[in-house]
A protein has these predicted regions:
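Bacterial Sec-exported substrate-binding components of ABC uptake systems
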Residues: 2-53, 162-202, 310-316
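Short helix-initiation/N-cap motifs at beta->coil->alpha
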Residues: 25-31, 86-98, 234-242
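A short, structured surface patch at a secondary-structure boundary
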Residues: 45-103, 107-115, 231
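Stable alpha-helical elements in mature extracytoplasmic
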Residues: 51-54, 60, 96, 119-122, ...
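Alpha-helical, coiled-coil/dimerization segments enriched in small aliphatic residues
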Residues: 70-77, 92, 210-238
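Extracytoplasmic ligand-binding site segments that recognize negatively charged/polar headgroups
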Residues: 75, 112-121, 131-159, 192-218, ...
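Proline-aspartate-enriched helix->loop->beta-strand connector
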Residues: 96-110, 241-257
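Structured C-terminal subdomain patch of bacterial secreted/periplasmic proteins
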Residues: 147-162, 171, 254-316
Length: 316
């Protein structure tokens, strides 16, 4: 009797539970699962910069008890916030199960690969321990989510805003993001096909092979939104440089990662006996995208597409 009433008096518990559907990670093939949040998470483990960026965007960074797998340059506008956060791990590695359990989080927000067999395993393991999970849509197996899209991270922001009960507070910011994406969609639609450059994404270069992204990756959607035509096809991964010569794109997107700096890749392209003949390399139509902007999705993604759109407008 009494304890129930006093609990009801506590407004944070009096609110109806927030029920959401979200994915498992790679260990569970990204299947959709339902979770019920009875209260606002207080101890969040945020894994990867894009996730941290998204939580700061929503203004809930005070709930983050630790961050992990954050190894690129901090996002400049959030520099101050990053400085206050505790790092559970340094560098590119994911934390161990023991390290995560030791932190006693009530919510883990991350990528699908964190919940893979070689890392934390299925989200089910955590949910059975009473620890909630949220896996970002653009990071789950593509067979679960379909091709990745810029707007999916905005859906994630809306779901997370619900979980943290900050929907009202975050509404204007989320609407602002949606408008920016709409503007890009309209500009892209209005651009005649003849004016759209054909674009290939290059992530790594290994002598006579290169590593590319696929048609279902977020980069393909970013290219389309920016007014280009993506030539990235169904199969990503390593391909022969001869294949790239056959495609001969008007423009290359080169991914900048912390471990493989972009300046080295661009230098290698110009010095390469085969790839230096590419139209995009000869004409120096190379656009750089940070790994952090194209994987998962955050404010940086929208900024990268806007910059790419301007680059295409100015150069083609």
């Amino acid at each position: 009797g009494c304890s129930y009433q006093s609990r009801q008096a506590d407004t944070s518990l009096a609110e109806a539970p927030v029920v959401i559907k979200n994915f498992d990670g790679y260990a569970g093939n990204g299947r959709l699962m339902q979770q019920s949040f009875n209260k606002v998470p207080q101890r969040v483990l945020a894994v990867s910069e894009s996730v941290v960026d998204d939580l700061i965007f929503l203004g809930v960074q005070d709930r983050i008890v630790a961050i992990s797998a954050c190894y690129s340059k901090n996002y400049a506008p959030y520099e101050e916030e990053y400085a206050k956060l505790t790092r559970l791990t340094e560098g590119t590695g994911y934390p161990s199960k023991e390290a995560v359990l030791g932190m006693q989080p009530d919510l883990i927000v991350s990528w699908g690969s964190l919940f893979g067999d070689s890392a934390l395993g299925s989200v089910e393991y955590w949910q059975q321990k009473g620890i909630h999970t949220y896996v970002m849509t653009n990071t789950v197996p593509v067979k679960a989510s379909g091709r990745r899209r810029v707007e999916y991270f905005v859906n994630d922001l809306q779901q997370l805003a619900k979980i943290f009960r900050v929907e009202e507070k975050a509404k204007d910011k989320i609407v602002g993001l949606k408008k920016r994406i709409q503007v890009l969609q309209l500009q892209s639609k209005a651009t005649p096909k003849a004016n759209k450059p054909k674009v290939v994404t290059l992530q790594y270069l290994y002598g006579n092979e290169y590593f590319c992204r696929t048609a279902s990756d977020l980069t393909a959607d970013m290219i389309a939104l920016a007014g280009g035509i993506s030539l990235d096809d169904k199969l990503g991964g390593r391909k022969s440089v001869e294949y790239l010569v056959k495609l001969d794109p008007d423009m290359l997107i080169v991914i900048d990662t912390e471990t493989t700096p972009v300046a080295d890749k661009i230098k290698a392209l110009h010095a390469h006996k085969v790839l230096s003949r590419l139209k995009a390399v000869r004409n120096n139509k190379i656009f750089v995208v940070q790994h952090r902007a194209f994987y998962c999705g955050s404010l940086r993604t929208v900024e990268a597409v806007e910059a790419m759109q301007k680059y295409i407008e100015d150069n083609f």
